[in-house]
C-alpha cells in the first residue's frame, strides 16, 4: 500500500534497483548548456552594432561591423554549426538506448564524432576571435566610445564562446564517467 512504508520511499515490486543514469542526465544538461551558449555567442556577434569611426580631419568616416573581420564571421558560422551538431547529439543521446549493454554501436560512434567536431569548431573559432581581438585591438577599441556597443558585444561573444567550449569538453567527459546517482525518469527494463 502507498504510504505504509516508514522509509518514505517508494518500494519497487521487483526489488531490483534501476541502473544509475546520472551521467546521462549530466551529459544532457551540459549539451543543452553548450547549445545555448554557442547560439548566444553567435547571435551576439552577428548582431554586433555598427560603429562609425571618424578620422582626424572629421570628414573621413569608416563603418565597422563584425563582417569586416574574418575571425568574427568564422565564429558565427562555427558556433551555428556547433549548435546544429549539439541538437543532433541531444537527439541521438535521448533516442538511443545506451542503458543496455547490447545497444547498437553506431549511435555511440556518432556521439564521439559529434563531440570531437563540436569541440574543434568551438575552440578554433574562440581562439581565432581571441587572436583577432589582440591583433585588431586598436580598431575594435576605437568603437568603445561610439553609440553602438560593438566592442562590448565582441568581448561578451568571445567569453560566451569560451564558456561553450568548456561546456562541450565537460559534456564529452561526463558521458564516459559513471555517476552513482539515478535521476528520474528511471530507464525502463
UniProtKB/Swiss-Prot annotation:
Localization terms from the record: Cell membrane
Keywords on record: Cell membrane, Membrane, Transmembrane, Transmembrane helix
Pfam families in alphabetical order: CASP_dom
UniProt feature coiled coil, ranges: none
InterPro entries: CASP/CASPL, CASP_dom, CASPL
GO annotation, cellular component aspect: plasma membrane
Topology of this chain in the membrane: Multi-pass membrane protein
Residues in the Extracellular compartment per record: 46-71, 131-158
Keyword Cell membrane appears in the UniProt entry: yes
Side Cytoplasmic, residues: 1-24, 93-109, 180-189
Domain of life: Eukaryota
Membrane-spanning ranges: 25-45, 72-92, 110-130, 159-179
Disulphide bridges, residue numbers: none
Keyword Secreted: no
Similarity section: Belongs to the Casparian strip membrane proteins (CASP) family.
Subunit structure: Homodimer and heterodimers.
Protein name: CASP-like protein 1U2
